[in-house]
Every structure is written in C-alpha cells, then in structure tokens.
Amino acid sequence: MSDILTKIETYKREEIAAAKRAQPLSVVEATAKAQGAPRGFLRAIKAKHTNGDFALIAEVKKASPSKGLIRADFDPPQLAKAYEAGGAACLSVLTDTPSFQGHLDFMVAARAATSLPVLRKDFMFDAYQVVEARAHGADCILIIMAALDDATAKDLEDTAIAFGMDVLIEIHDRAELDRALKLRSPMIGVNNRNLRTFETTLATSEALAPLIPGDRLMVGESGIFTPADLARLERVGMSTFLVGESLMRQADVTAATRTLLARETTARATGTR
C-alpha cells in the first residue's frame, strides 16, 4: 500500500472507532434496515445504455488532495439537480472530510434533491462504513482494491449486497483486476489516476479494458475532461464514466454535463457518427 493510502487508512480507522463508540453497529443496522429500498445504481446505468446513451456517474466534490479546493461555491443539492438536468445516470458524493472536505450530510442532501441513485465515495476499510452508508441512504459503495486485502474486500462486498446495495470495484493495474474478478459485483472501475504518484493517464483504461471480461461493466474514472476523452475510451469498449473535477469547475454544470455527454459532439471528436 502506498504512503498516502497508509496515511488515509490510519485516520479512517480512527474515524471508524469514534463512530462505533458514538453509535454502535446494532443502532446503525436498525437505521439502515428502516431505509427505503436502494434506487438501483447499476440498473440506472444499464437504462442509459439501453437508450443508446453514455452513462455518467457525476461527482459532487469540493476538494481533493492533489488539486486542493475545486469548487468554492459548493451546494450539494443544487449540484445534484444540475447533474440530473444535464443527463447524469447516477451521483457520486465524496464523504471523506480530511482529504476531500466531504461529509455524509452532503450525500444525504444531494440524494434528497434528486431521484438519482448515489454512490458513497469514500475509503472503506470496515463493514461498519457500509452499513453507515446505507443508513444515510447510499445506493452503492466503492471498494478500492489498492487499499484492501482480499478478505476485507469480500467482507465489504458481502455486507453491501446483504443490504441490497450495488458495489463499484476500483482497480488501477492488472494485479488489482485479477483480485477484483474474484468478487461478485459486475462493476469494475478503472482509475486512470495512480494513487501512489497521482499521475493520471487514459492509457491505463486503454491497457486494462481489453483484459476485463465481457460480463463485467467497465467504468472509466479520473482524467476525463472532454467529449474526445469519452470517445477515446469508447473505442476500448467503455460507455460508463465517473467524472467530477472537470464538471465541478464549470459555472453552468448542467450545460457542461450536456456538452460532455452529447453523442453528436463525441461522434465529431472521433470522426464518426
């Protein structure tokens, strides 16, 4: 595990211990079970594909460790509505505070403002966080293979499935892909950003996409800014994308989302229709 992930795990485990003291698992489980059924994250993505559209997982993100503050005018409900109006399939909301200035309350507010299913975007190390996510309404969780051993990844996935949630499994290299394929969830996210160096290149998706079995749903993550980027990844079979920073920096988020997803624009970028 990289130094940054080790640092993140250290503060996350402190957060988890504090959360367990404040609210025992049994209490959080009761809240999670009282929630309505998850909205269906994977189902929403497939619905876009059925209509011949790209599926966008639009990210609500205030800041990041590598870029600092991304959006000063940060209003999660308004941003969620803007993404929905722009054609997003799902939302991803950062809930990590120390590195991303996120919060679970942001996820709750964003989800309440739309009908879109929501991913809790955070570093998950303990099944408690999965139950906590569902208790706050999350429809999907993230499993980052670079941060976890196989047993923990399976435990997180099993917990999510037990609560009816979807799981996005994130990888960055061949070894992580091989481990991810041992899990049950069909969504495989290829992070184009190296969490060890923060170097970002779409070549990562181009290299790994051909190795992902056809029964899995590929998600391109990080380094996606333009319709040409979508077109480039579409050439290796990707039609689902997680995009945050490039849209968060726009004054008109709805218009920027529509422009990114416009098929005609993408067709022009590739020279095809």
UniProtKB/Swiss-Prot annotation:
Q: Which Gene3D superfamilies match?
A: Aldolase class I
Give the GO molecular function terms: indole-3-glycerol-phosphate synthase activity; phosphoribosylanthranilate isomerase activity
State the top-level EC class.
lyase
Please, one GO biological process term? L-tryptophan biosynthetic process
Q: In which pathway does it act?
A: Amino-acid biosynthesis; L-tryptophan biosynthesis; L-tryptophan from chorismate: step 4/5
What PANTHER family does the annotation carry?
A: INDOLE-3-GLYCEROL-PHOSPHATE SYNTHASE, TRYPTOPHAN BIOSYNTHESIS PROTEIN
Q: What is the designated name of this protein?
A: Indole-3-glycerol phosphate synthase
Q: Which organism is it from?
A: Bradyrhizobium diazoefficiens (strain JCM 10833 / BCRC 13528 / IAM 13628 / NBRC 14792 / USDA 110)
What does UniProt list as this organism's lineage?
Bacteria, Pseudomonadati, Pseudomonadota, Alphaproteobacteria, Hyphomicrobiales
Q: Which gene encodes it?
A: trpC
